[in-house]
């Protein structure tokens, strides 16, 4: 089994360019592409709906994002296994744990005298996160490349590593979690198009917008806290 970074990124660029051209020119309504969405299974549509809803609620600082997120990650456990995106499948297990933690953490602070404030990332957290992403990507990517038939083992592992950090920061109400999500979601759009998961790719395209809204909302809250 061989893996070519050049081949992947050329393919990724072609897919992502085509996808956004269709979105921006309303070609999503063309018969051929509509047929692709029609062929999308009901399970993926359920994952898309719950995924978008939970991220939108998180952007609005709403605690009910967590139980809906739990439903979404369980659905995507099965979807990613079927698509041989094993790093993403493993990521859902982590998300399941972190969603339960986030639900508990937010509920605990909600019931306290003061709501948990939005915080910003520290220099130490940046260094530790960067180091963790590099080590995790190399370790998991190498394992998947040598031992499985995973699609895009290193790219998938890199996105998984970034997502681990972003999810932890989301649960801890760190403002910059949204910037990490924007970066990762842009990559994920191309990956999922490459695997013919068009509804999921569209969901992640919407995630980019929602993450931008979330960042602006949380930044406003952070500034109000410090005035």
Listing of model-derived features with the role each one plays in the protein:
Residues 81-88, 143-151, 171-174, 193-198:
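Membrane-interface helix caps and helix-loop-helix hairpins in membrane proteins
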Residues 107-109, 215-226:
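Membrane-interface capping segments at transmembrane-helix boundaries
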């Amino acid at each position: 089994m061989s893996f070519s970074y050049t081949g992947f990124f050329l393919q990724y660029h072609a897919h992502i360019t085509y996808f956004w051209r269709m979105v921006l020119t309303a070609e999503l309504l063309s018969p051929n592409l509509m047929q692709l969405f029609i062929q999308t299974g009901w399970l993926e549509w359920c994952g898309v709906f719950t995924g978008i809803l939970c991220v939108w609620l998180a952007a609005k600082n709403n605690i009910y994002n967590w139980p809906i997120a739990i439903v979404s990650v369980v659905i995507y456990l099965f979807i990613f296994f079927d698509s041989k995106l094993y790093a993403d499948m493993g990521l859902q297990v982590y998300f399941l744990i972190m969603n339960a933690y986030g639900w508990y953490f937010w509920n605990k602070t909600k019931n306290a005298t003061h709501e948990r404030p939005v915080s910003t990332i520290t220099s130490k957290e940046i260094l530790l996160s960067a180091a963790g992403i590099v080590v995790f990507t190399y370790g998991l990517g190498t394992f998947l490349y040598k031992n499985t038939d995973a699609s895009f083992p290193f790219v998938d592992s890199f996105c998984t590593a970034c997502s681990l950090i972003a999810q932890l920061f989301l649960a801890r109400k760190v403002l910059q979690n949204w910037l990490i999500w924007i970066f990762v979601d842009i990559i994920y759009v191309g990956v999922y198009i490459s695997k013919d998961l068009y509804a999921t790719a569209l969901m992640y395209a919407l995630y980019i917008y929602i993450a931008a809204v979330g960042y602006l909302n949380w930044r406003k809250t952070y500034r109000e806290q410090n005035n």
